[in-house]
Design a protein with these regions (language model features):
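Glycine-rich phosphate-binding loops of nucleotide-dependent enzymes
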Residues: 2-278
C-alpha cells in the first residue's frame, strides 16, 4: 500500500444464502480524499459499509485499513467495537441519534473510548479521580467545538429528537467526528435535505476533508452532492463494480448511464432529469 492509501478492498464478496449482494469488489480509498460509492437501489452499497464496520463478516475478501505510523489491520477479522477504536467512524441511512439525550450529550457519548481509557475502565470514574475529571472536561469542550462548527451550539441543551431533520443530519456527522476517525463512512447524509441544506452539507464535508485530512467514504443518491465534492467515484450495479475513476470519467461512462437509464439510453451525455448531471 502507498503511504496515502487508507483503505484497500480486495475481492470483497458477500452472500446471503443464494443471493450475491457484493460480487468480487475491489477498490481503494485515499487519505485526504472523498470517495463516493454510487449505484441504483439494491446495488449493495450499504452492504459494503456493513462489511467495513463489522456488522457483517464478508464471505470472501480482504479489507486492509492502514494509518500512517501504524501497522495495517484487516477489518474483516475484527469486531465492530475494535474497528471503531482503529479509527473507522460511521453514520447510517436512518438517523440513529439518542433522541431523549441532549444535543451535547450525544457528542460526549461518541467519545466513550477516550473516557473509558481515562477512567481505567470505570475505576477512576467511580472514584472521581482527576484524570477522569480532566478527560470529561475535555470531552465537553471538544463536543462544544463541534456544535459551534455545525451551528448548533445554542441548541446544546435541547433534546436531539426535537431538532429539525437537517440539523439532526449534521449532528450525526459531528457525532461521528467526535470519535476522531481516520476514515469516515457516511451513508446517504443528504437524504431528505433541501437544496440549501445539501449545499451546507457539501461545505461541511469539504471542510472536514481539508481541515482534518481524513478519508471519507460516501454513499449518496444526490448526484449534485456526489459530483460537487467527490475526488473519486466507484459505481456498483447488482453488487458488481462497473466504473471507478474521477467524477468526469464516471459521468460519461456508458456503463454508468446504462445502469441508471437502461439499455436504450443515448450514451453521449446523461439527459437532464436523469439523475446524472450533464
Amino acid at each position: 500500500m502507498t503511504v496515502t492509501e487508507l483503505l484497500r478492498v480486495e475481492h470483497l464478496t458477500m452472500k446471503f444464502g443464494g443471493l450475491v449482494a457484493i460480487d468480487d469488489l475491489s477498490f481503494s480509498a485515499t487519505q485526504g480524499e472523498i470517495t463516493a460509492i454510487i449505484g441504483p437501489n439494491g446495488a449493495g452499497k450499504t452492504t459494503i459499509f456493513n462489511c467495513l464496520t463489522g456488522f457483517y463478516k464478508p464471505t470472501i475478501g480482504r479489507l486492509t485499513f492502514s494509518v500512517l505510523g501504524r501497522d495495517p489491520v484487516y477489518l474483516e477479522r475484527m469486531e465492530g467495537f475494535r474497528i471503531a477504536r482503529a479509527g473507522v467512524g460511521r453514520t447510517f441511512q436512518n438517523i440513529r441519534l439518542f433522541p431523549a439525550m441532549s444535543v451535547l450529550e450525544n457528542l460526549i457519548v461518541a467519545q466513550h473510548n477516550e473516557l473509558m481509557r481515562a477512567s481505567f475502565f470505570s475505576v477512576a470514574g467511580l472514584f472521581g479521580l482527576s484524570r477522569y475529571r480532566d478527560a470529561e472536561s475535555d470531552a465537553v469542550k471538544f463536543a462544544s467545538q463541534w456544535l459551534d462548527r455545525i451551528g448548533l451550539l445554542p441548541d446544546a441543551d435541547r433534546q436531539a429528537g426535537e431538532l429539525p431533520y437537517g440539523d439532526q443530519r449534521r449532528l450525526e456527522i459531528a457525532r461521528a467526528m467526535c470519535s476522531k476517525p481516520t476514515l469516515l463512512c457516511l451513508d446517504e447524509p443528504a437524504a431528505g435535505l433541501n437544496r440549501n441544506e445539501s449545499a451546507a452539507l457539501n461545505e461541511l464535508l469539504r471542510n472536514i476533508r481539508d481541515t482534518y485530512g481524513i478519508g471519507i467514504l460516501l454513499i449518496e443518491h444526490d448526484m449534485s452532492v456526489v459530483m460537487n465534492i467527490s475526488d473519486h467515484i466507484v459505481v456498483l450495479d447488482y453488487g458488481k463494480k462497473i466504473s471507478d475513476g474521477s467524477p468526469v470519467s464516471v459521468r460519461h461512462d456508458p456503463r454508468v448511464i446504462r445502469a441508471y437509464l437502461g439499455e436504450e439510453a443515448d450514451y453521449g451525455l446523461a439527459p437532464i432529469g436523469s439523475g446524472l448531471p450533464c
